[in-house]
Amino acid sequence: MSIPFINRELSWLEFNQRVLNEALRGDLPLLERVKFLAITASNLDEFFQVRVGSLMLLRRSGRKNPDPSGLTPVQQLTEIRKRMQRMIEDQYKLFTTVLCPALQEAGIRLVDSKNLSPAQANKVAEAFHDSISPLLTPLAVVSGEEPPLVPALQLIVACRIADSETGAIRHALIPIPDGLPRRVSVSDGDGVSFVLIEDVVARHASELFPGEDVEATACFRVTRNGDIAVQEDDAADLAGEMEEVLAARKLSDTVRLELPASLPRDLAKVIQEVCGAPSEGTYRVAGPLALSGFMDLAFTPGFDNLRDEDWPSQPSPDIEPGDSIFDAVGRRDVLLHHPYESFEPVMRFIEEAADDPQVVSIKQVLYRTAKQSRIIDALIRAAENGKAVTVLVELKARFDEARNLLRAEELQRAGAQIVYGVKGLKTHAKICLVVRREDGRLRRYVHLGTGNYNESTARLYTDISLLTCRPEYGADASLFFNAVTGRSKLLRFQRLVPAPTAMKPRLLDLIASEAERARQGEPARIYAKVNSLQDPDIIAALYQASKAGVEINLNVRGICCLKTGDARHSKHIRVVSVIDRYLEHARIFYFHHGGDPEIFIASADWMGRNLDRRVELMVPIEDSRARRRLLRILESFFQDNTQASKILPDGSSERLKPAAGEKKFRAQEHFFKEARRSAKARDHERAMTFEPHRPK
């Protein structure tokens, strides 16, 4: 039997619209609006690479089977283009008519290369000759010959060139290397003034073609299909196979071509032919391409008045100053709510393990890491110090494959045992196991979390960490690593719930249990916080629970395929999405369970790919303080009346506002203030504790 289901791709576009809505808000600081606009553009880049690329492959294969929402690939592509046109128009209208004038008034000026003063023109020429021109490689476009390879997601300047003697017309492309900054400064001491690098290249393009006249230029940008999977069944060498995937992406089909709105027809034709771009994948934009490249503008020094007030991460009150992490975790479980509480204890956990002579072994899963990673450095140091270091490096982490290959090679050279993931599955679990010798016995310490071991994104994403030395968790962690490194099965776990073997059945049982309690007239309640909700089985179970009368509150940041407001299926289901300063990334689940709640954190969203095709972990929380805290966190999202939006029956959303007489409540601000208050209270408690000096 079919169930009400919102299309996944259209739901994602609604999420991106919610992000764009933040950029449209006149009450946000100006540079925060620029940041949100850049995020929407970056999101769209990945959406086209992965989701649109996949749909275009399905269309080409002739597949006409509808998805659970009833839409075929062709219908999805048609609807995506229609909505994309509106979103792009909104993006560029905001950028050109609102943000640019406001930035100029504030002293941050985007200067048209056609309107440079003599002093500015000299600066641009100097920058071109010294820092740009030596890195450029013009590519000729010759009729009848194989067209040059156009790099994906790079700015390319197309040129129409006339021979100065014969007048013969030809065309060429000038790719702008990724390593070059987007902005070329022409500041004169009064604020910040800059020219876009593509305009600098276009202005000086004639210098690259001596003896010829550059009659016209236009910037364009290509997005290629990034949904290219490794053929693991035939891959004896996974690392080598991943290198082939990376190479294949450079040659994959064009899924989007971005062109200026005002573009000479002959240049447009040449560009489309060179790129092999379908007409339905071509988008004309009224402004600079690659708005994602304006992210760094949001961090322009000296304009703090145009940014949000800083919310510094706070120390955990459960970790005493001067304590080792092992001392703190040895006393009781430590729950951390990032970034309100610092990620530092997680990094220290691994760094201390690397240097502690009592530590025997470290085992860890790495999915995405920072470019300059203290965690990688610590693991290398641990291996060099003679500890048994085992690292599962997931090579199939999309768009991080190249970095992960390099990381794995560095670790292997240091002496670490490296495993390249699990065949046929992505390993997405967040787990680190440290074995330490204490009083002649081995004791296991475990970090389990919802987010990556990435100190850069840990400042921008909200996540939950648990540090524990409970024996059952340590035993389960050992079983987990034995399974993923030794080709055994994920069985006999006492506490941890792994996917793809046990997590989905356990979730379905938990939901069904709440439904049965509701049918018996008992209180029944579910709270869940996920990034995405797409799995049809989970959605069907939630519908059944709603029919039984279970009160269901879902905080879904992004994709939500569950249809709200359906009197038959979802009468008792409320879904909100919170878009704020930090990217909501934590997964937290609460089941009332007859008054003895079951509370979990997890690495997995409620999506088919996570529950059926990835190695994930769901972690029960047993510490009473941590359980109460997680419930308060969940409840706070449903009190938010400033940054939360209600998901409507058609998949769109409506921003929530305080009711008459109701105070404003912003969940993320509340979490920051709570973390600061807890840290101050702990400092005060320490200050009031007298510790006498004792004779030796």
Give the residues covered by each predicted segment:
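N-terminal localization/anchoring segments of enzymes in phospholipid and broader phosphate metabolism
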Residues: 1-526, 535, 544-548, 560-582, ...
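Cofactor-pocket helix-loop regions in the catalytic cores of large enzyme subunits
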Residues: 531
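Polyanion-binding catalytic cores of nucleic-acid enzymes and NTP/SAM-utilizing transferases
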Residues: 538
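Hydrophobic alpha/beta core scaffold segments
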Residues: 551-555
